[in-house]
Curated annotation (Swiss-Prot):
Residues covered by the GRAM domain: 200-247, 827-893
Name this polypeptide is given: Sterol 3-beta-glucosyltransferase
PH domain: residues covered: 251-351
Biased composition (Acidic residues): 60-70
TM regions (residue ranges): none
Molecular function, one GO term: UDP-glycosyltransferase activity
A Pfam family annotated for this UniProt entry: EryCIII-like_C
Catalyzed reactions: a sterol + UDP-alpha-D-glucose = a sterol 3-beta-D-glucoside + UDP + H(+); ergosterol + UDP-alpha-D-glucose = ergosteryl 3-beta-D-glucoside + UDP + H(+)
Domain of life (superkingdom): Eukaryota
Amino acid composition bias (Gly residues), ranges on this chain: 677-696
Compartment annotation: Cytoplasm; Membrane
């Protein structure tokens, strides 16, 4: 019977087998797939994974059928391992496509191939059944309470994820819901009803017509800049792609240290702690100060994330950039793999940020499809490139790349039977454009992944059903608030079109390698320019320019601008009407060569095109770049250029507002082309007129004059030289000027004036103003400026919603902002703090933030989920605090006279203090905060998923990418699997061959215990594990099924000398050198013997031999330890802890000093051992490169926050707990009665135990403990380990009589005992410290030696305990009372416990090992054959030494 980990590993091992061909049907039992992993291949994994899930699409009940069906919530699920591993049903056959007139028996292909829950459950071992997962005795559950944290090894992880995913599978759940409501029908009626049920759900979700029939359903992958798993639904009129991409709110997707470049050079950079979340990328000066970022990047505005070439290494760059509309931000990682992982994570999150909502919905009308081309991008899949007309307004061609691992030919057949033509790649670019001209398009493509240029989505899917008359999309565009696209300012330039294209292309984001490779392949197939290159292979602007030859549409890389009037690439059908006032209808070419014939009610000129977001305002074209920077069609541009040179016809035509087919003015035309055209934009001097008009004046102005520019109402054009034309232009734009009577409200800034230029003038056109309006504008601007300054210094308060001011009547709230101001302020707030478009501003206050004793003046914002702050007056303080971590907001007095204070209590953080100039403002802020806290607290955990599920999804995600990359030999785009949370932690990619891990350590029981936990998890991964340590731990280690090898040394002697000296000192070195010189030789020899045959070596650095053994064996080498051993400025070396904090320079110096002194003491013996036993040359500190060795710290990040100066290969994984309490432990009845009596008496329970330390006077220590317990009035559970070693008396017999308030025990598992007591006292060992804090216990630490002093300081710095420097009755009793009664310490310890319980250090360690395995191997290989240059004599003999050793190996190998 397979274990859960084996079940998972077999599936992972199947992934790289791409060369096998999978048949569509299987003759054997589908459950046999679990027993024969080598029969699987990537096809079965990917296809079944794709067909397994479309969860979350139809989670709302259908109101039309009136059934209350329980469907899965929108929480995230992953591709079920069980589903992906199940072979197709033996009866499943390839689906037969059907036309729209014939009703198929079963159009849902994925349903017919989806394994049911029962069949998958039968394939599971009995131990993995859902029943077994819930089995926990009520007694044990009641004992552990909230502090329970079971051991989550890979086996348990696989069990939980498997069951949850089976239950949450879309098809299983939807079928189950259907069976619940419609069960009992005959088979034919049953299938018909099921198809109708799915159709109804699809119509509501994709906004289709009520009578539209579902024809077929296929699993598919959409290839954009990421690879997205989803489903393709073909109906009678549409082709719909649906995929579920839920998000985990406020979750850290990836974090680590990066160097941020300054001045575009990595030579001048600052190292930051960087955190990637759903919609933002933030960097912090310190990993502990996570509420005050140094900067935040809004990913909804990011264009791309890509690797960039380093100055030193182009093949494996360690740098990457985040491309923004106006700049690029450069970062440098510590390794190429780390940079690659950051880029993959950023690409996924940028895509999610651009997508509308948590689902990818693309609805393509079949009538819009211009061409279907079957291409060969992947050798193992069918790829279909679909060219579609975007809308009847732009007639631009979009391209969608769909990849099918099955049913590719069936999809083509189904589409052709529904009237879609297939070119087979024979269409030229010109033929594609001609095909567009003959298309009768009445609908627009609806794509949730495309944005406005301002970062806001089109709301395509608001209504349940869309309109099919071609107007619905326009309504949706105009109903939402219009945003001015960026980079739309027309510019007069003398450059040739091809020169502008080259410059523009050079500024576009550079394509990744895998895209450039695909691009080159496609370019070779094209006759002309690479016009048929898919849009994901080139920038959106470049693709649109080449494919449509001048589809002049505003765009921002892959983002889409708001609906605006643009020239189509080919004339539409005659009679088409514009959908919005002031928008040009596509004209038709005439024999006279004129283009752009206008229709009634449409202001137009032959050479103008209206600006986005401003109805009726036109801008010229010609050789001037269009709204998105793309050139006009060549024929139109040449014609308009010729007209401007002639100077007559265009001007006349534009002045009258209409043109004849020949381009002349229509007789009798007036300035107002129709009653519906505002402002008479077709009148004399209208914007866009040629000759001496607005733009024409730039060419016709006298020599030596420079056209002026003016700003008015956010519209920007080059002002004419002719005053009359200028006045006419001002009159034309007057109705669109902000101000009284204009109809456009004046923007009211909430003192965020720094962003006005960005939001008000980017990408807009400017027109001149008349003197009266200019005077009014200046006065209004002065008044607005004075108002802002007054608000800035008076500490004003503003509310941004009536529903948040219940304590006042709507008419009485003097702080309520206007509707326009609410909109503008929300936009600026969302942009500044990068919190997403769903975050809404509630209130804002001017106040001081006190941080580090220094007041900083700025503005505090309260939003739906955050309280934020930004500073004024040239400072850069930024604060972002989620409301879910705010425990309370309380009033306080201010530091300055007359000021009022507000204190925010934060979970696991220091209080944040605000100071207000007025008590009323402070009170208002308190009310708003507390009210919002009451609103969100019931929903804090609504979107939180299981950490196990979150982790395994990312593992599967990386496995898909790595497998495809390995077999297809191409650089794959990042993969987003349906239902994935996009965690980018390094995946659990199990090595193809099982390995022997040797774990080498010395010391006490606490030093060995973490390695047992790691060894158990590695065994469940399928590897062999060996622990090499002292002989007294042999039975304990072998009891867990782990191999044991002995190394020399007596732990008791080691601890005695360390206790005697306490810390690392000169006397310690002198005694150690005299007593342990012989022991070091034995340790080195025994360690070498214990590591023979190992494939990977993980060593505690205190063992001293591991790095040399790994070099001799040429195997990957890792270090793992419980205390700081790597150089950093954040903490001192654990053996050299000062009495007071000495700063970063001193901390770093302690590591340098320790490394040199430690190596000086053992270097002679080590080098002799290397030469004699290992046959290696002498070495030194520089050659060993210890700082480059991958390091695993088995400590929680809550206790040891990662320093910013730690490189990427140093990981703080979390504690490696060995939960022995869950291993059939039965507590002593005497202990249970003692604990119950203490509870009944209302006394606090305290555990006191100092581990296996050695003390000189055990009786005196016991006496001090007993007297302190009695004085503090607590009950004590005493574990007297200090008498177990080197004592004269029996350790089980007490030295002094113990009172009834004290119960002595021998051994009791910490994971069983600690959740049931109130505080703990111990020696400060890493394992005991972690166990106590995990249970949320206030901790008292009395250190004796080594790292215990370090952890005593850390616990005290965290506020979760007390560092007891002297163990006497007075100080110990006081500490006991503080730990059991101080609410501040109790609350802080509970917060740290919650964080530790959310971690899984063992799984994180295995992830780090797998990820850094190649890196560790490269370090060892680089050292091979090295000889220090300081010893030239030995250097000459190095090669001979190596040859002799190799020859000896060959002789022994062949038994010669």
């Amino acid at each position: 019977m397979l274990s859960a980990s084996q079940f998972l590993k077999h599936r992972v091992s199947c992934l790289p087998m791409l060369n096998k061909v999978e048949s569509d049907s299987t003759d054997g039992d589908p459950d046999d797939a679990c027993q024969h992993p080598h029969d699987c291949n990537i096809f079965s994994v990917l296809v079944n994974g794709a067909t397994d899930r479309l969860e979350g699409f139809f989670d709302e009940s259908d109101e039309e059928d009136g059934d209350e069906v329980e469907t899965p919530s929108t929480t995230t699920t992953a591709v079920s391992p069980s589903a992906t591993m199940s072979a197709p049903s033996p009866t499943a056959t390839a689906p037969t496509p059907h036309s729209g007139t014939h009703t198929p028996k079963s159009p849902l292909h994925s349903i017919s191939h989806c394994p049911s829950f029962n069949s998958v459950a039968q394939a599971l071992p009995h131990s993995l059944s859902p029943h077994s997962l819930c089995h926990t005795s009520s007694h044990e559950a009641s004992r552990r309470g909230s502090a329970e944290q079971p051991s989550r090894t890979q086996s348990e992880l696989a069990r939980r994820i498997k069951t949850e995913n089976i239950l949450n599978s879309f098809h299983d759940s939807l079928e189950a819901a259907y069976e619940k409501c419609h069960g009992g029908a005959n088979p034919e009626e049953h299938q018909s009803n099921k198809t109708e049920y799915f159709q109804q759900k699809l119509k509501g979700f994709a906004a289709l017509d009520v009578d539209e029939q579902l024809i077929a359903d296929y699993p598919v992958w959409l290839l954009k800049n990421v690879l997205i798993q989803g489903h393709l639904y073909i109906t009678a009129k549409h082709m719909c792609f649906l995929s579920y991409l839920p998000r985990r709110q406020n979750a850290n997707i990836r974090s680590g240290t990066l160097v941020k470049a300054r001045k575009r050079s990595l030579r001048e950079g600052t190292r930051y702690w960087c955190v990637l979340k759903n919609d933002s990328f933030s960097y912090y000066p310190d990993s502990t100060d996570v509420y005050f970022p140094a900067g935040t990047i809004d990913l909804s505005e990011a264009l791309a994330a890509e690797l960039c070439d380093d100055e030193g290494d182009v093949t494996e760059p360690e740098s990457f950039r985040i491309v923004m509309p106006k700049k690029s931000v450069l970062f440098k990682a510590d390794s190429h793999s780390a940079a690659h992982e950051w880029v993959k994570a950023l690409q996924k999150e940028i895509f999610r940020a651009h997508n509308q909502g948590d689902t990818v919905r693309i609805v393509i009308p079949l009538q819009n499809i211009v061409d279907l081309e079957k291409t060969k991008i992947f050798e193992f899949a069918t790829t279909i490139k679909t060219s579609v007309v975007e809308s009847n307004e732009t007639y631009a061609i979009d391209e969608y790349i769909f990849t099918f691992f099955k049913f590719g030919d069936d999809v083509l057949r189904t589409l052709t039977e529904n009237g879609v033509e297939i070119s087979g790649g024979n269409f030229s670019p010109r033929q594609s454009q001609l095909a567009v001209g003959h298309k009768h398009v009445t609908e627009s493509v609806r794509d949730s992944t495309l944005l406005h240029a301002s970062g806001h989505h089109h709301h395509f899917f608001h209504s349940a059903h869309h309109e099919s008359d071609g107007k619905s999309n326009s309504k949706s565009h105009t109903s939402s608030r219009s945003h001015t696209p960026r980079n739309l300012t027309p510019q007069v330039t003398g450059e040739q079109p091809h020169e502008r294209d080259e410059k523009r292309d050079s500024k576009l984001p550079r394509l990744p390698k895998f895209l450039r490779r695909f691009k080159d392949k496609v370019d070779d197939k094209c006759d002309d320019k690479p016009t048929l290159v898919p849009s994901f292979l080139k920038s959106r602007a470049s693709s649109r320019r080449n494919s449509a030859e001048g589809s002049d549409r505003p765009n921002l890389a892959s983002q889409r601008t708001s609906s605006s009037t643009l020239f189509p690439s080919a004339p539409p059908t005659p009679g088409s009407q514009p959908t919005t006032p002031g928008v040009h209808a596509p004209g038709s070419s005439t024999p006279g060569g004129s283009y752009g014939t206008t229709t009634p009610g449409t202001p137009a000129s032959a050479d103008s095109v209206s600006l986005a977001g401003t109805p009726g305002v036109a801008a010229p074209v010609g050789d001037i770049e269009g709204l998105n920077g793309n050139p006009m069609p060549a024929g139109i541009a040449a014609e308009l250029k010729e007209k401007r040179k002639s100077g007559g016809a265009t001007s006349s035509g534009a002045a009258t507002g209409a043109t004849t087919p020949g381009g002349a003015a229509a007789p009798g035309s007036t300035g107002n082309s129709s009653p519906g055209t505002p402002g008479g934009l077709g009148g004399p001097g209208a914007v866009g007129a040629g000759g001496p008009g607005v733009m024409g004046g730039a060419e016709s102005a006298p020599a030596g004059t420079v056209p002026q520019q003016s700003h008015h109402a956010g519209i920007s054009v080059v002002a004419p030289h002719d005053p009359a034309a200028a006045a006419a232009a001002a009159d034309a734009a007057a109705p669109f000027t902000r101000g009284p009577g204009s109809g456009i409200p004046e923007i009211q800034d909430d003192s965020d004036s720094s962003d006005d230029d960005h939001w008000g003038h980017i990408g807009t056109a400017e027109v001149d103003e008349d003197p009266e309006q200019d005077t009014f504008k200046k006065k209004n601007k002065r008044f607005s400026t004075l108002s802002k300054v007054s608000d800035l210094w008076s500490g004003s308060t503003k509310h941004y919603g009536k529903h948040h001011t219940e304590r006042l009547g709507d008419d009485d709230d003097k702080h309520l902002a206007s509707a326009e101001e609410i909109t503008e302020s929300n936009e600026r707030f969302q942009k500044r703090f990068a919190l997403g478009t769903e975050e809404r501003l509630i209130a804002s206050y001017h106040c001081h933030l006190h941080r580090g004793g220094i007041p900083t003046y700025g503005k505090m914002y309260v939003s739906t989920n955050y309280v934020t702050f930004r500073s004024f007056l040239r400072t850069k303080t930024l604060m972002i605090v989620p409301l879910k971590v705010v425990e309370n907001a309380t009033k306080d007095s201010g530091f300055k006279f007359g000021y009022s204070g507000l204190v925010l209590t934060i979970q696991g953080y220091e209080e944040i203090f605000f100071e207000f100039a007025s008590a009323s403002h402070r009170d208002d802020a308190e009310v708003m905060l507390l009210r919002q806290l009451d609103i969100i607290r019931p929903h804090i955990n609504d979107d939180i998923k299981s950490d196990d599920q979150y982790m395994l999804q990312s593992a599967r995600l990386c496995t898909y990418e790595d497998a495809l990359k390995a077999e297809a030999n191409v650089e794959m785009p990042p993969v987003i699997i349906d239902g994935n949370l996009a965690s980018v932690l390094p995946g659990l990619v199990t090595p193809q061959s099982k390995m022997l891990f040797t774990l080498l350590t010395i010391g006490s029981r606490g030093d060995v215990q973490p390695y047992i936990s790691l060894g158990k998890a590695l065994i469940e991964e399928g590897h062999r594990v060996r622990i090499a340590t002292h002989s007294e731990f042999k039975d304990w280690i072998e009891g867990y099924g782990i191999e044991f090898k002995e190394v020399a040394g007596d732990p008791s002697e080691l601890m005695k000398i360390m206790v005697d000296h306490g810390v690392f000192s000169v006397s310690f070195l002198r005694d150690a050198a005299s007593k342990f010189r012989g022991w070091i030789n034995e340790l080195l020899a025994s360690s070498w013997e214990a590591c023979q045959g190992s494939d990977v070596l993980i060593e505690s650095p205190s063992a001293m031999a591991g790095i040399h053994i790994a070099e001799a064996l040429q195997i990957p080498y890792f270090r793992a330890f419980t205390m700081p051993w790597s150089r950093t400025r954040a903490y001192p070396h654990a053996f050299i802890v000062p009495d007071q904090k000495m700063g970063g320079s001193y901390n770093y110096l302690t590591y340098v000093m320790f490394d040199n002194v430690f190596w000086k003491g053992i270097s002679g013996q080590v080098n002799r051992w290397r030469k004699k036993t290992l046959h290696l040359p002498r070495t030194n500190l520089d050659h060993m490169e210890q700082n480059k060795v991958p390091f695993l710290y088995n400590v929680s990040p809550a206790v040891l926050p990662p320093p910013v100066d730690f490189p990427d290969w140093i990981k703080i994984t979390g504690y490696w707990f060995l939960d022995e309490g869950s291993k059939d432990y039965t507590p002593d009845d005497k202990l249970c009665r003692f604990m119950e009596k203490a509870r009944n008496d209302g006394k606090k329970l305290v555990y006191i135990g100092f581990g296996s330390i050695v003390v000189s006077d055990p009786t005196a220590l016991t006496k001090s403990v007993v007297e302190s317990v009695l004085k503090a009035d607590v009950r004590c559970i005493l574990n007297k380990g200090w008498s177990d070693r080197l004592g004269k008396k029996d350790a089980k017999e007490p030295e002094i009589p113990l009172p009834e308030e004290v119960l002595q025990i021998t051994n009791c598992p910490h994971d069983w005992l600690f959740p049931q007591i109130d505080a703990c006292v111990h020696h400060g060992g890493s394992g005991t410290t972690g166990a106590g804090l995990r249970a949320g216990l206030p901790t008292i630490i009395k250190p004796f030696f080594g790292d215990q002093f370090f952890y005593a300081n850390r616990v005290e710095d965290l506020g979760a305990g007390i560092h007891l420097r002297k163990l006497n009755v007075s100080q110990f009793s006081k500490a006991l009372w503080e730990a059991t009664h101080n609410e501040r310490i109790i609350a802080k310890a509970a917060a740290v416990g919650r964080q530790i319980r959310s971690e899984n250090g063992v799984i994180s360690a295995i992830q780090a090992i797998y990820r850094d395995l190649d890196y560790a191997r490269s370090l060892v290989q680089k050292k091979r054959g090295y000889t220090p240059t300081s010893d030239k004599e030995e250097e000459t003999w190095t090669l001979v030494d190596d040859i002799e050793r190799q020859m000896q190996d060959e002789v022994e190998k062949h038994n010669l």
